Amino acid sequence: GNEDKLDEAPDPAAFVRGVPAATAPGSAYRYNSLGSYIAGRVVENASGARLDDFAAKALFAPLGITRWSWGRDVANHPKGQGNLSLRARDTAKIGQMVLDDGVVDGKRVIDTSWLQAALAPRVATGAVDRYADSYGYFWYAKTQDIGGQQIAVYFASGNGGNKIYVIP
């Protein structure tokens, strides 16, 4: 699909700009790696730092994540759509931080309002994804019956079946 073409494009951002939208934003769920790539570039532009450098300072260091690698595109930008390698224990740290409302060791790492916005349902997915009811900012949600209670379960899903589940 387009992700393979993105990886081969001499100018990945220009390639993304040239792909027409299949639907209006927010109107239908259609996961697309191109949007994730552009989100990474937006972070770079907003922060003034490479995506991996920003993540290292703002997220990985506060979580104690010291071993990771992130693949780069031909323009030498970290691939916002994936290729981030973390140890299982480090993905668990991200999940625990989300469970703890963005706080790690008593220190706020992610703003509460941003985390709530990321987890909020933005588009329904149930018609095309039986494992999720909705998708937010890179997080899925599914209401599960757990012990007779309806509980919202949140999860991030990566290539190759990698997942982070957060069950409040």
Where are these regions (language model features)?
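A beta-strand-loop signature enriched in Asp, Gly, Thr, and Trp
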Residues: W70-K79, D101-G126
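Carbohydrate-binding/catalytic loop surfaces
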Residues: A75-L86, Y135, W139-K142
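...with weaker cross-activation on analogous glycine-rich loops/strands in unrelated enzymes
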Residues: Q81-G95, W114-V128, Q150-V153
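Active-site-proximal alpha-helical segments within enzyme catalytic domains
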Residues: G35-V42, G80-V103, N162-P168
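Catalytic-site signature segments of enzymes, centered on catalytic residues
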Residues: G1-G82
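Non-transmembrane alpha-helical segments in soluble domains
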Residues: A13, R17, G40-E44, A55-A56, ...
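Active-site Gly/Thr loop motif
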Residues: L119-I167
